[in-house]
């Protein structure tokens, strides 16, 4: 009987923890940060924007949720999330960050978003966007790494020597800009979105390597070379005069030369 009571209590605890609660009325709270961080990690459906008119992290949340909001610095990382697992309805979670020129790595998860008019600029820039999250902003780097998964998205201009683009789980990237080397690992019905600028696709590279699989699609411009392996009904559309003899295709995949 005692074991049964304990088991029922545990089930009730999990059921309560999983309930959706009302976020409550919106309130705002400021959190002090040093500004020395180079990495940002955001979870739990926060909408993040960047401003040069604030000097603290400004959070807007429901008054029932605000006591559980965590904004903390750990080493070179700034972390923003909700303590414990909670699902809420009502007031949207928002965060306004002071502009930080040193920011070079952004990790978003749990349907979070990050929007900046200032972009990210560093020798190495890394984005890890997962769980239906999205990033809007430009990137300038020697080497840029973009990892998108779980129906996440990127929208911005990239200027880099090397761009590594890893996409999976129906993610999409709307990319413009010029890179010397483009390395693609695109799978699971993900898409580099068709984006035409001045009569050619807006993402331009000298050399493109990598793979497309699982009904994925990419649109790019190159006057150099494209050496990509395509499978599972994937398609690579390109403009320019790139050599494509190094490409391989299987499973109804193809490489398409588009002329506008």
Predicted stretch roles:
Residues 1-17:
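Sec-dependent bacterial lipoprotein signal peptides
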Residues 10, 19-128, 136-145, 155-157, ...:
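Acidic (Asp/Glu) and glycine-rich low-complexity loops/linkers
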Residues 156-260:
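Short, surface-exposed interaction patches in beta-rich subdomains
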Residues 44, 71, 131, 150, ...:
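A residue-level signal for conserved active-site and pocket-lining positions in enzyme catalytic cores
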């Amino acid at each position: 009987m005692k074991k049964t009571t304990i088991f029922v209590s545990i089930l009730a605890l999990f059921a309560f923890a999983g309930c959706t609660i009302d976020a409550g009325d919106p309130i705002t709270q400021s959190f002090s940060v040093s500004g020395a961080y180079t990495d940002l990690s955001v979870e739990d459906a926060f909408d993040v924007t960047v401003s040069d008119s604030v000097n603290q992290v400004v959070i807007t949340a429901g008054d029932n949720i605000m006591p559980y909001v965590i904004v903390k610095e750990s080493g070179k990382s700034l972390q923003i999330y909700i303590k414990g697992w909670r699902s809420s309805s009502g007031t949207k979670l928002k965060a306004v960050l002071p502009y930080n020129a040193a920011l070079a790595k952004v990790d978003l998860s749990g349907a979070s978003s990050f929007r900046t008019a200032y972009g990210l600029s560093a020798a190495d820039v890394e984005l890890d966007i997962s769980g239906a999250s999205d990033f809007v902003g430009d990137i300038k780097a020697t080497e840029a790494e973009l990892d998108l998964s779980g129906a996440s998205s990127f929208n911005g201009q990239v200027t880099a020597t090397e761009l590594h683009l890893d996409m999976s789980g129906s993610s999409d990237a709307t990319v413009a800009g010029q890179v010397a080397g483009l390395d693609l690992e695109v799978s699971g019905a993900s898409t580099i979105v068709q984006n035409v600028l001045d009569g050619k696709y807006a993402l331009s590279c000298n050399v493109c390597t990598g793979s497309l699989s699982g009904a994925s699609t990419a649109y790019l411009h190159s006057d150099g070379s494209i050496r990509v392996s395509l499978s599972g009904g994937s398609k690579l559309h390109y403009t320019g005069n790139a050599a494509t003899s190094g490409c391989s295709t299987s499973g109804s995949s193809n490489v398409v030369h588009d002329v506008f």
